């Protein structure tokens, strides 16, 4: 079994992110189950989702031993409760709520062989008593609490692919070490760090000798795209900026469900993809689809099966049986929708093939793409 799992509280800020993640999960046809872990003191009144199954867990907003308020304690705590109460078996794709899919994730992992997004720019060093696990001298206090501090570990982060059996091994220790890092580590300004759970995860995995295969799985929105080339997931932890340097989108300031201005081109492709996903969802909630522009790049959804009968083609999505017959002109349009061409460029290519003007072809192109988007066979990026 394959599970996509993310941990949340029950509040409006987490709700819109959960809805957007769920929408993108459905749009790409991600295999398996989508599970939203909800840390709550009111398990009888869980939030509502269209496709995700909500699972109530005990709230760990505050660490009981220290009184430290840090809602991210809920991540290891909720996972720990889920794996032992439900006893799932299989691969878990572990996400944060501020993630969206632009492609499905097809990789699976076996027990003892997790994979995760490489933590770009992490300055891993030589492990020693003064530099436990190589994660930095500022964590030397871990030698008082951890075993095997002389072992090196590959620095990874969300998204992660990990087997449920490995989660059972590490989640308790991950939670405990998160509390220790929050209690002991201070940055140069004397502050606790927000990323405490990320360092604690690395340390817990090192103790269990659980090395991750570092892969391109999720692009953070403040990274150079080369840090996570062709990543199927966008992690919008940081703002999207335009080529002029202006902020186009920030999760902290976004008001759902407003359209995002597309008049300024985002600096990177993943920014354009994220804005397209958000705007597509805004239109879907309103019962329509986003109008096409010449700069939109249609891309075929994964897993669509093709069957030819004479000069026609049947497209079918096995998961739900959705299907569509395409004639010869529709087939020509479909075959060009690989994400590399925008609508205008598709018109140019078809004009050359059919000896018609782009203006003559435009109605058929727009109608075909509109219908394919309606049934989820195509997605758009800017």
What kind of region is each of these model predictions?
Residues 73-125:
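GT-A fold catalytic core of metal-dependent nucleotide-sugar glycosyltransferases
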Residues 14, 44-47, 64, 100-104, ...:
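Short catalytic/ligand-binding loop motif for oxyanion handling, primarily in non-cytosolic enzymes
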Residues 1-71, 82-89:
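N-terminal anchoring/stem segment of glycosyltransferases
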Residues 212-291:
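C-terminal catalytic/acceptor-binding lobe
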Residues 292-318:
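Long, low-complexity, charged/polar intrinsically disordered regions in eukaryotic proteins
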Residues 309, 319-382:
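Long, charge-rich, low-complexity alpha-helical segments
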Residues 16-19, 23, 73-77, 195-203:
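A structural signal for well-ordered alpha-helical segments within the folded catalytic domains
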Residues 144-238:
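Catalytic core and acceptor-binding pocket of nucleotide-sugar-dependent glycosyltransferases
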